[in-house]
From Swiss-Prot:
Source domain of life: Viruses
A biological process from GO: mRNA transport
Nuclear export signal and binding to XPO1, short sequence motif: residues: 63-74
Organism: Human immunodeficiency virus type 1 group M subtype B (isolate BH8)
Keywords: AIDS, Host cytoplasm, Host nucleus, Host-virus interaction, Methylation, mRNA transport, Phosphoprotein, RNA-binding, Transport
Membership in a protein family: Belongs to the HIV-1 REV protein family.
Entry protein name: Protein Rev
Extent of motif Nuclear localization signal and RNA-binding (RRE): 24-40
């Protein structure tokens, strides 16, 4: 069943090739706009097909988190830098009561 669903989704995506880069700027823009709209429709149809075949909802299961007053961010390495450094492994520390309790600076 899953292989059939994947084949069907693959066929849907193959039936909508990217637009040709010819014609006036306006014509190319319109073709890209229509192509993106068809891609969105194919994406939503694909989600419905997968949820039907797999028997589960497309909605993500909500993540269970501890109460907000017990959450802190671990900022050991390069917190002030921009870019993508340190993005790979965010850490959440639990049970640090003094960090979020008072809103005043010491």
């Amino acid at each position: 069943e899953l292989i059939e669903a994947v084949r069907l989704i693959k066929f849907l995506y193959q039936s909508n090739p990217p637009p040709k880069p010819e014609g006036t700027r306006q014509a190319r823009r319109n073709r890209r706009r229509r192509w993106r709209e068809r891609q969105r429709q194919i994406h939503s149809i694909s989600e419905r097909i997968l949820s039907t075949y797999l028997g589960r909802s497309a909605e993500p299961v909500p993540l269970q988190l501890p109460p907000l007053e017990r959450l802190t961010l671990d900022c050991n390495e390069d917190c002030g830098t921009s870019g993508t450094q340190g993005v790979g492994s965010p850490q959440i520390l639990v049970e640090s009561p003094t960090v979020l309790e008072s809103g005043t600076k010491e």
